[in-house]
């Protein structure tokens, strides 16, 4: 097989990355026949600005996620049904799984860890909210450019000054990521983290910033532009009035802990989780905060030790030996994982409150390091303790098949609105919105009595739910006309 180039990677008989792509497509194949759900109606179906290129261009001045909206527009023009949207999302996820493999391989110098990490990234059902749920494209498409930019940056030569062609290409992908979703502004910080963990030479911050100059210029320019658009300023002002800083941080901490548990408790996956707004300390929140502090402190200690070790090693190397020997991969993995996770969640889970405290799609990129830590533990245990790699592969295959089975089952729930919202109210029985949406799904299906019961339940939970009250009146009228 002749080698070909993808972001500067020569692939000769590269079965593993293509196996990952095939697996990703396989587990999401049944998602192609899913329908529009939840926010898809406001974002796509009932949004005229994504129904034609002219309308998209007229709306371009809003400055909000225009590249994402362009993909919606092109999908809509190809056919105003959900099939094409699902194909696009599935391709994005397959590409991301491919990129995760190569980034993990560059980070760990270990193809086995890279393969297992990318495999579980591809098949784990927590990703369905970013793949099967059409509006989750904001996360998966942004990740294509974000990870692509990072991978292109790894090709930058340390002696290239301003980054060379790969630096420019990386910066271009960064710009595309910003035009897809604003949280991608964290990329320059991720580049610094990558250098600190992966660089084979002692860190010279001035040289590093020079290589990243275009990224930081885009970062500063984008922040400036965002504040010029009234939509962004109105959104920020609205968000800041939702809850206090203390209440938001405590609620987010609890929400992060709850969502992380979904990586193991696969039956708890939920498109509309009922997470409480926490305004005061409790024993549970205190334990969660203490655990977070321990993890962050360990990450800082590990990263500082890693940087110091590189510096000390460089001092004793012969002058003609410019590259530091490859460090132990496990401290690198741990340090990178802790700070990557923090960097990815800072925009959505810290200072600016959101109506929904947290959603599973916010973990699409952050979850990479959860799979990385899991894969590293698997390899370490079976390679160095049990010393049985065949047993490891059997374990990996069984777990991947189990996760893939849950993903296929989760995709099936997205097949229609009734199935999705029946699943949601089982998992969030005290949240009025789920019952209102279930009632509307029943109403559209002509099941007016079921719709009335669902609306009544929503009003029982929240008597001030105006939309449910209006929908109930509409359901009563439709029921009488039968």
Please name every model-derived segment.
Residues 2-476, 480:
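Polytopic membrane enzymes that build or remodel cell-surface glycoconjugates and lipids
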């Amino acid at each position: 097989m002749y080698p070909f180039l993808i972001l500067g990677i020569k692939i000769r008989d590269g079965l593993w990355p293509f196996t990952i792509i095939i697996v990703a497509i396989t587990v999401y194949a049944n998602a192609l026949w899913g329908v529009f759900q939840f926010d898809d109606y406001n974002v796509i179906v009932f949004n005229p600005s994504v129904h034609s290129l002219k309308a998209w261009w007229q709306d371009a001045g809003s400055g909000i996620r225009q590249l994402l909206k362009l993909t919606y527009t092109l999908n809509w023009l190809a056919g105003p049904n959900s099939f094409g949207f699902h194909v696009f999302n599935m391709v994005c996820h397959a590409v991301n799984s491919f990129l995760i493999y190569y980034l993990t391989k560059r980070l760990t110098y270990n193809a086995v860890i890279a393969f297992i990490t990318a495999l579980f990234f591809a098949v784990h059902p927590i990703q369905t909210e970013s793949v099967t749920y059409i509006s989750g494209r904001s996360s998966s498409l942004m990740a294509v450019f974000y990870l692509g930019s990072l991978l292109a940056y790894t090709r930058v030569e340390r002696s290239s000054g301003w980054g060379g062609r790969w630096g420019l290409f990386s910066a271009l992908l960064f710009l595309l990521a910003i035009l897809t979703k604003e949280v991608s502004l964290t990329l320059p910080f991720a580049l610094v983290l990558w250098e600190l963990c992966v660089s084979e030479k002692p860190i010279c911050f001035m040289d590093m910033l020079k290589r990243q100059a275009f990224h930081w210029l885009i970062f500063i320019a984008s922040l400036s532009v965002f504040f010029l658009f009234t939509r962004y300023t109105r959104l920020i002002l609205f968000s800041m009035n939702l809850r206090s800083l203390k209440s938001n941080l405590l609620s987010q901490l609890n929400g992060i802990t709850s969502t992380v548990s979904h990586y193991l408790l696969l039956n708890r996956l939920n498109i509309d989780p009922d997470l409480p707004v926490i305004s005061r300390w409790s024993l549970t929140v205190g334990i969660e905060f203490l655990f977070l502090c321990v993890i962050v402190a360990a990450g800082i200690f590990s990263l500082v030790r890693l940087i110091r070790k590189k510096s000390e090693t460089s001092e004793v190397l012969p002058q003609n030996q410019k590259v530091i020997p490859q460090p132990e991969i496990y401290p690198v993995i741990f340090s990178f994982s802790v700070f990557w996770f923090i960097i990815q969640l800072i925009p959505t889970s810290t200072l600016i409150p959101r109506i929904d405290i947290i959603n599973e799609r916010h973990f699409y990129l952050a979850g990479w390091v959860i799979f990385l830590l899991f894969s590293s533990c698997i390899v370490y245990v079976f390679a160095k303790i049990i010393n049985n790699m065949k047993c490891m592969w059997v374990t990996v295959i069984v777990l991947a098949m189990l996760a893939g089975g849950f993903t296929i089952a989760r995709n099936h729930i997205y097949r229609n609105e009734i199935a999705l919202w029946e699943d949601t109210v089982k998992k969030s029985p005290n949240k009025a919105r789920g019952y209102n949406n279930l009632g509307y799904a029943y109403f559209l299906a002509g099941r007016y009595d079921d719709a009335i019961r669902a609306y009544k339940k929503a009003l029982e939970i929240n008597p001030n739910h105006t939309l449910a009250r209006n929908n109930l009146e509409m359901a009563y009228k439709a029921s009488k006309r039968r």
